[in-house]
Amino acid sequence: MNNQYPFQKLPLPYGFGALEPFIDTRTMMIHHDKHYGAYVDKLNAFLETCPDLQGLSLEELIINHSSIDEIRHNAGGVFNHQFFFENLRPGISQIVIGLSGKLLQTIQRDFGSMDKLREQFSTSANGVFGSGYTWLCAYSNGRLCIVSTPNQDTPLTLGLKPILCIDVWEHAYYLKHQNERVKYIQDFWHVVDWVKVSERLG
């Protein structure tokens, strides 16, 4: 991901309209250029005043310095947005290609089936109060779990390895889905990049 200060706003790995009709073009433009871009700018502005932190990676900042609000909110915002954008792909989700081998076996072992994973993940995402994210993560022993984090908190501070996330801040879906977060979550499953999720699991 984005390596160290000064952090750059990474381009989307697809066009703004590539996730239509599930996530609309205007939402992606505002989400990427305005919201994500603002976190990059605010993180760089803070780090400009902290030379001793400028050599740290995004992950190191989050894991070691999240007690600093400017790091927790802005480094978390950069990490979470990049992670979210990168686990989406245009067109119908590559569920057959990506869900094979180790990933499929691990999901079946820890959730029983893909349908049960989706059900539990969707329930958690819909249950986030206010703003935040829901994550599929791996423990150090390789077992999978679902966690939700408020605001721009990340699973990194919990010692977990994230492999999939959904952004449930209202700016991620409100222009298209209004107050129908459930419909947004349903649409999310159509654009998950399971190949990327499999790579993250390792």
Language-model-derived ranges and their functions:
Residues 1-202:
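Feature for soluble, non-membrane regions of globular proteins
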